[in-house]
């Protein structure tokens, strides 16, 4: 199912060649500032992993990974990563990082079952980051502090780009607003979860929606989350209001990661207790992995937002249906 929002009178602020230069400037600046703000070291990351390790991100539990056999390892099958949520935690231990230190990677992934639209592509590029914390720091206060630091990087990036390209619009407020999924449901009980996000984002301009993955009082979930990386009580999404498309625009999903207790509880709720036999999960239950906070920040997403684009295909080269390509060209949307 392909759906396309076509903003009336849309005209890109930058042509294709200027856009390519601006993409590089945006990514370089944001990456450097994020690493400084969170004390992160860049590390190399895998494009594929062995399924038996349990390291791939199961996302909402139904997305199929791209898998292929490799001649050099006896024809065994490997999977292209969906994200590096679990891999990073094992890497922090293996590389000898200490509390207060972290890593980040340039993560490229293929999500073959993604529904393609203005914001979603089968090609995913993000900065995946992870930082070690103490068990005593697994609190909402820690989460909010890190979110505020990341938001300050967004603010600096917006100011940097508006200095380079004065015709670009600035959309971000001074501060980010914190809200839980239950508070959001209580505020807008008649709306769907996505409609609630847009309603509040439109008012506040930048929000952090906390506690995603568990069931709300209404009996529904705000959104799905895999049970084995984020602690559903200590996670959230950074969401901005994006006037070009008039919607809530998620730029990052993040959270304090599960400990040995919340992992077991969430696996049970999700009906995934068989995962306890996988290598990653065994190490976590046995307290052999560090306590961490981490997340992913969409590279194409932030370029699209800051450069005022109507479609993610204007800031990344991907695959689109013939119908979408045709519609885009009729509405001044210049796909790469």
UniProtKB/Swiss-Prot annotation:
Signal peptide: none annotated. GO terms for molecular function: aspartate-ammonia ligase activity; ATP binding; catalytic activity, acting on a protein; transferase activity. It is found in: Cytoplasm. Pathway: Amino-acid biosynthesis; L-asparagine biosynthesis; L-asparagine from L-aspartate (ammonia route): step 1/1. InterPro entries: aa-tRNA-synth_II, aa-tRNA-synth_II/BPL/LPL, AsnA. One of its GO terms (biological process) is L-asparagine biosynthetic process. Its main location: cytoplasm. It catalyses: L-aspartate + NH4(+) + ATP = L-asparagine + AMP + diphosphate + H(+). Belongs to the class-II aminoacyl-tRNA synthetase family. AsnA subfamily. This is Aspartate--ammonia ligase. The lineage of its organism: Bacteria, Bacillati, Bacillota, Clostridia, Eubacteriales.
């Amino acid at each position: 199912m392909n759906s396309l929002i076509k903003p009336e009178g849309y005209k890109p602020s930058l042509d294709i060649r200027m856009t390519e230069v601006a993409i590089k400037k945006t990514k370089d600046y944001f990456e450097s500032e994020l690493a400084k703000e969170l004390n992160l070291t860049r590390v190399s990351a895998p494009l594929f992993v062995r399924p038996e390790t349990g390291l791939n991100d199961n996302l909402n539990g139904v997305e199929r990974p791209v898998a292929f056999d490799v001649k050099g390892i006896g024809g065994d099958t490997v999977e292209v990563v969906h994200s590096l949520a679990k891999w990073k935690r094992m890497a922090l231990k293996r590389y000898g990082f200490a509390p207060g230190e972290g890593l980040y990677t340039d993560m490229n992934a293929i999500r073959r079952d993604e529904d393609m639209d203005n914001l979603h592509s089968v090609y995913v590029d993000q900065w995946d980051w992870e930082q070690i914390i103490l068990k005593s720091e697994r609190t909402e206060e820690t989460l909010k502090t890190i979110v505020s630091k990341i938001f300050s990087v967004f603010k600096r990036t917006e100011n940097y780009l508006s200095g380079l390209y004065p015709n670009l619009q600035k959309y971000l407020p001074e501060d980010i607003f914190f809200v839980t999924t239950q508070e959001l449901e209580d505020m807008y009980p008649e709306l769907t979860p996505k409609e609630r996000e847009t309603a509040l984002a439109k008012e506040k301009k930048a929000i952090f929606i906390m506690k995603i993955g568990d069931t709300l009082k209404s009996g529904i979930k705000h959104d799905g989350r895999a049970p084995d990386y984020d602690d559903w009580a200590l996670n959230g999404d950074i969401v901005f209001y994006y006037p070009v498309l008039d919607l809530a625009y998620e730029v990052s999903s993040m959270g304090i990661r599960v400990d040995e207790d919340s992992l077991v509880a969430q696996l049970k709720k999700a009906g995934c207790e068989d995962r306890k036999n996988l290598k990653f999960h065994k190490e976590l239950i046995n307290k052999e992995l560090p306590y961490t906070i981490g997340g992913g920040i969409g590279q194409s997403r932030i370029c699209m937002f800051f450069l005022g684009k109507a479609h993610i295909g204007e800031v990344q080269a991907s695959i689109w249906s013939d119908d979408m390509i045709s519609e885009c060209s009729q509405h001044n949307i210049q796909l790469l």
